[in-house]
């Protein structure tokens, strides 16, 4: 079965780095390479405060960067909370927070809501990530699946592991998913569900964050779920994925994610409701995350720093 490549994957794979005009719904910061940060001598931002909310995938990165920034520039105040990518977009659009965190581009409804309120969304890629399909070790120590096979599991078409592959346990599949609005869930469904017309089974067990999914998979025999790359642990088995039958199976690794060979590779973003004023705390904090110091923190948190050159570029 031939499946179309999601638009977000096509853009990333081609390495097209440009500012998307507002007619397209949002602006994409064209700089993936960490910039050279030059800040003018202006101390007003040193007593400012900003708030950030959104993606639980990006949360560890942004929280660690906020702590490092506040330790380096005393007097600044940055509060960070999760809630999912949907919350990040909605609170940026509504002016509740200064910066949103997202693990996906905005949905059309979010773009429409922003337009109605006169908001021009700006997206800033801050890291590379992957949505990793993971299972409890009781399923198997190695598992290779096509995206469609994964989709059938999460849609409830397969309900026992023995139906998926010969030799797997004849046990019920315990499906774990993220909540609606989660960027991780949205990205997963874009690749493994929507191309085949599948929807998540009503029997799936919903968890509110990557850590919650991780804990469930680690402690529930015969379970399957998905987490961001930075949340994978030795207590779970990572599934190798193939885009379709006959294509190579690829494990999520630093190399396969950076080259976008792993089928569910993605960027993580910061989002603002307008282009930040030069020299503002928002502007400076985004620059900090994109700086070499900030990108080192990205790696320390288990994610991939931005490439010097775009994939395919």
PLM region spans:
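Juxtamembrane low-complexity tails/linkers enriched in Ser/Thr-Pro and polybasic
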Residues: 1-4
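Exported/periplasmic ABC-transporter solute-binding proteins
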Residues: 6-313
């Amino acid at each position: 079965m031939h499946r179309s490549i999601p638009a977000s994957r096509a853009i990333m794979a081609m390495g097209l780095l440009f500012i998307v005009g507002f007619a397209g719904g949002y602006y994409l910061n064209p700089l993936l390479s960490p910039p050279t940060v030059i800040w003018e001598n202006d101390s007003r931002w040193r007593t400012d405060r900003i708030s950030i909310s959104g993606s639980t995938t990006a949360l560890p990165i942004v929280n660690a960067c906020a702590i490092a920034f506040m330790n380096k520039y005393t007097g600044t105040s940055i509060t960070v909370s999760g809630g999912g990518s949907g919350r990040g977009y909605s609170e940026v659009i509504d002016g509740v927070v200064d910066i949103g965190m997202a693990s996906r581009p905005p949905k059309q409804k979010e773009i429409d809501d922003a337009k109605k309120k006169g908001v021009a969304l700006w997206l800033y890629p801050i890291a590379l990530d992957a949505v990793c399909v993971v299972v409890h070790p009781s399923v198997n120590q190695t598992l290779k699946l096509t995206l469609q096979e994964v989709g059938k599991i999460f849609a409830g078409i397969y309900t026992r592991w023995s139906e998926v592959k010969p030799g797997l346990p004849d046990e019920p599949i315990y499906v774990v998913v993220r909540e609606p609005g989660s960027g991780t869930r949205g990205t997963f469904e874009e690749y493994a569900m929507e191309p085949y017309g599948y929807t998540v089974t009503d029997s799936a067990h919903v968890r509110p964050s990557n850590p919650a999914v991780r804990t469930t998979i680690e402690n529930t025999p015969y379970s399957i779920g998905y987490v961001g790359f930075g949340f994978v642990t030795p207590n779970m088995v990572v599934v190798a994925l193939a885009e379709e039958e006959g294509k190579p199976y690829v494990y999520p690794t630093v190399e396969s994610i950076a080259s976008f060979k792993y089928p569910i590779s993605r960027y993580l973003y910061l989002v603002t409701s307008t282009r930040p004023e030069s020299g503002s705390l928002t502007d400076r904090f985004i620059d900090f995350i994109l700086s070499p110091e900030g990108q080192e923190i990205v790696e320390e948190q288990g994610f991939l720093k931005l490439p010097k050159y775009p994939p395919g570029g």
